[in-house]
């Protein structure tokens, strides 16, 4: 069982058995407020220094497919590598549709991921290598706003930690693919800095499962 599946199963059990119910967007959910988890590099114990491209190819081959998780192989690969497909995205800040890749690499014309790398190249011990996705001038007027709000890259002992904050996260439908996307991002940044990616420091305000997914999610923990 890979790290993404083990974390997914653990958190699904906690959320489904918590009996903490809420109604979100007119849909019942079960949720946990204030979740903090460490999601390790899936190759942490490997003698090989696997880079982001090798990780993506493993995703594409199905090495990280998870039973009962609806997104697999090619679809996972496309999502994970969306950071490298920015030229295929319409770069229009006034459009309704956004992607994390767009907000991170074209936030009002600014490439925040490039800024992170340059900041850490100047000072590897910096706590200032931060990128945001929320745009108050646009998102306060929209129903659909980014779930992932902030990332921070920290280098400690020649290893990169990616600290992330989600305002809201669909545990059953999105958590594994989100973690693979962020692992790819962490590996990509680490590769540019010539350090090893260590882990994701995950923070989420509302981690939840929608009522429509209860039945399928329950199969995961049976």
Name what the model sees in each region:
Residues 1-222:
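Terminal, non-catalytic protein-protein interaction segments that mediate quaternary/complex assembly
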């Amino acid at each position: 069982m890979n790290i993404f599946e083990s974390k997914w199963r653990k958190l699904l059990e906690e959320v489904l058995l918590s009996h903490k119910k809420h109604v979100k967007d007119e849909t019942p959910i079960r949720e946990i407020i204030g979740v903090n988890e460490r999601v390790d590099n899936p190759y942490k114990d490997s003698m090989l220094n696997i880079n982001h491209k090798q990780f993506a190819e493993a995703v594409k081959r199905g090495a990280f497919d998870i039973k009962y998780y609806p997104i697999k192989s090619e679809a996972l690969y496309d999502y994970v590598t969306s950071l490298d497909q920015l030229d295929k995205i319409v770069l229009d800040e006034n459009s309704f549709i956004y992607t994390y890749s767009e907000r991170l690499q074209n936030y009002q014309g600014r490439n925040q991921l490039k800024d992170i790398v340059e900041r850490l190249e100047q000072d590897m011990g910096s706590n200032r290598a931060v990128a945001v996705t929320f745009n108050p001038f646009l998102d306060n007027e929209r129903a659909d706003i980014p779930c992932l709000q902030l990332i921070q890259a920290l280098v400690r002992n020649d290893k990169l930690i990616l600290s992330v904050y989600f305002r809201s996260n669909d545990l059953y439908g999105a958590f594994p693919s989100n973690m693979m996307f962020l692992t790819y991002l962490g590996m990509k940044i680490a590769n540019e800095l010539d350090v090893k990616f260590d882990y994701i420091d995950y923070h989420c305000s509302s981690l939840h499962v929608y009522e429509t997914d209860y039945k399928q999610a329950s199969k995961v923990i049976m």
